[in-house]
UniProtKB/Swiss-Prot annotation:
Membrane topology, as annotated: Multi-pass membrane protein
Protein name: Uracil permease
Gene from which this protein is expressed: pyrP
Source organism (scientific name): Bacillus subtilis (strain 168)
Main location: membrane
Record carries keyword Ribonucleoprotein: no
Keyword Cell cycle appears in the UniProt entry: no
């Protein structure tokens, strides 16, 4: 646990001025990633800001104000949302997000009763690591299309060197910030990259700023409400695309809680308990699905802010959530976000999606997965080829389809459960995942 000086404890209330300044730091840390996800999947960034704020406040309430964590849009669900939206529209994506939230809740209840051993047995690093790699690499074509083409959503793609140059400049700015900046600025390379890329795009004439000028200061976000904007319908196809991702993101959630516990110097997995943290994520994701927002997850960027500032106050986190919620209703901010060219987002995504894939590789390295063991080699190889190759199982009746990352995760879990494991390896695995 950390023994460094603490500037504000978890339950300490800051002074008004420092409260606002500390909260804005957390807002800037999560802003780039939180608005990027809805931009990539064709959802409203303003709604994502609102759901990020509401979800974080709900999380703080459920965890009894004991865990200083901020929740933002989850990158893991980008591909499944795009897939489900293509076949069933935005409403289907919201149903899928709702199901993912329910799965979080179910897992939280099981962890409360049974502990985490069963989850670690189903989803060890040899399964989760390759699936995370698939998530990142599976998004590579999306990043490339946004960077290279004038309109990545057009039926006929037209290559644009101008757009590609904007993406390249955006990527360069983001990389420079990530490597050379220090302190808080090193935590917001995505936001700085988007701003820098946007300014360069203005000089290239590919930004339409008129909607920002025309937008009202106050505007209600484009919420998607069940039974009003769509009729919810649960299908096997939606469940198959979204639910497996929820299991994979559990490992990410547990990892964040372990890191957060070390940073703050308190064992949040024991008190208030991992089950409460996951239940908080469950409620946040369900609330997001009810108004048109993407599934949520705890953000590593904000853990970085905590580590640098040594300000652990949940009141600061709550302040950031309230500001994000308010920003969602400022029409000009929403219009400004919408005016960001796809090339800028593509440039940032080159790095972000690669980092996602690299984090899966890092998980394998950190857990010392032995690839001289044929069992590990087989599980990883099959997951990677199925996931990156885009394999799918389709049943014509009922439109049921399991594809890509979801299928890779399912096959990986099955292989992990049925392939024999040496007794020595079982003992090592048990030690690695004891929480």
């Amino acid at each position: 646990m950390s023994k460094k000086k603490v500037n504000l404890g978890v339950r300490d209330v800051p002074t008004p001025f420092s409260w606002v300044s500390f909260s804005l730091q957390h807002l800037f840390a999560m802003f780039g990633s939180t608005i990027l996800v809805p931009k990539l999947v064709g959802m409203s960034p303003a709604v994502a800001l609102v759901t990020s704020g509401i979800g974080t406040l709900a999380y703080l309430l459920i965890t009894k104000g004991q865990i200083p964590a901020y929740l933002g849009s989850s990158f893991a669900f980008i591909s499944p949302i795009i897939l489900v939206k293509a076949t069933g529209g935005p409403g289907a994506a919201m149903v899928g997000a709702f199901l993912a939230g329910l799965v979080y809740g179910l897992i939280a209840l099981l962890i409360r009763q049974l502990g985490t051993g069963w989850l670690m047995k189903i989803l060890p690093p040899v399964v989760v690591g390759p699936v995370i790699i698939v998530i990142g690499l599976g998004l590579a074509s999306t990043a490339v299309n946004m960077a290279m083409y004038a309109d990545p959503n057009a039926s006929e793609l037209v290559y644009s060197l101008k757009h590609f140059s904007v993406a390249g400049v955006t990527l360069a700015i983001t990389i420079i910030c990530a490597i050379f900046l220090r302190g808080f600025l090193s935590l917001i390379p995505v936001l700085i990259g988007i701003i820098g890329g946007y300014l360069f795009a203005l000089t290239q004439g590919i930004v339409n700023f008129q909607p920002v000028l025309d937008a009202k200061w106050f505007a209600v976000p484009e919420f998607i409400i069940p039974f009003k904007d769509y009729s919810p319908s649960v299908t096997l196809g939606i469940a198959a695309a979204m639910v497996p991702v929820a299991f994979v993101t559990m490992s990410e959630h547990i990892g964040h809680q372990m890191v957060l516990s070390k940073v703050v110097g308190q064992d949040f997995i024991k008190k208030p308990g991992l089950h409460r943290s996951i239940m908080g994520d469950s409620v946040a994701t369900i609330l997001a699905s009810l108004i048109g927002g993407p599934p949520t997850t705890t953000y590593g960027e904000n853990i970085g802010v905590l580590a640098i500032t040594r300000v652990f106050s949940v009141f600061v986190i709550g302040g950031a959530a309230v500001i994000a919620l308010c920003f969602g209703f400022i029409g000009k901010i929403s219009a400004l976000i919408s005016s960001v060219p796809s090339a800028v987002m593509g440039g940032v995504s080159f790095l972000l999606f690669g980092i996602i894939a690299s984090s899966g590789l890092r998980m394998l390295i950190d857990n010392k997965i032995d690839y001289e063991n044929n069992r590990n080699l087989i599980i990883t190889s099959v997951i990677l080829v199925i996931g990156v190759g885009g394999a799918f199982i389709q049943v014509s009746q009922g439109g049921f389809q399991v594809s890509g990352m979801a299928l890779a995760a399912i096959v990986g879990v099955i292989l992990n459960l049925i392939l024999p494991q040496a007794k020595e390896e079982q003992a090592d695995t048990s030690e690695q995942h004891h929480i």
